[in-house]
Amino acid sequence: MPFTEGTTFSLILDCLRYWVMQYHVDGFIVNPYICNPDELAKDPVLAKSKILKKEDGFQNVMRRFLKGDEGMIRDVICQLKNQDTQLYNYIASHNGFTLCDVVSYDGKHNEANGENNLDGPDYNYSWNCGAEGPSRKKAVTELRKHQINNAFFLLLLSQGTPCILAGDEFG
């Protein structure tokens, strides 16, 4: 749920309860810096719900590994073997680059949306595979396809719940 820092715990609790009771939602992803998942799990209405924590560690390590940063093997192994059942693993999310962007851009290019390129994180750990943005070069497009496949391999090989951003499965 996209709650912000100013959201009170009681409002978060009321919203999640509503989704469970009215729409029979059986799980949520929450930012542990905004609300404590353990506190949510104590609520009688939410007790049987799956409450997963959003944490960028897996995303950042895997992106750095995919783009070839040195010294990442140990971190990759630790992330792949992490068995925290409250975490979910992802390489792309609603906040930042899509998987296709990760292999197509070295930096943000959000100038056209009116936010002066200030939206989304500045640290995307991305690599454009030899050409910034869309490319028709066969070597670049093939490398990008391989990198996307590698990302899915790492994601699905990891322990825990994999999360794929809607649309990323199409490349």
Positions of the model-derived regions?
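Residues that line or immediately flank small-molecule/substrate-binding pockets and catalytic motifs
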Residues: 32
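Conserved alpha/beta catalytic core and glycan-binding cleft of carbohydrate-active enzymes
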Residues: 24, 36-166, 170
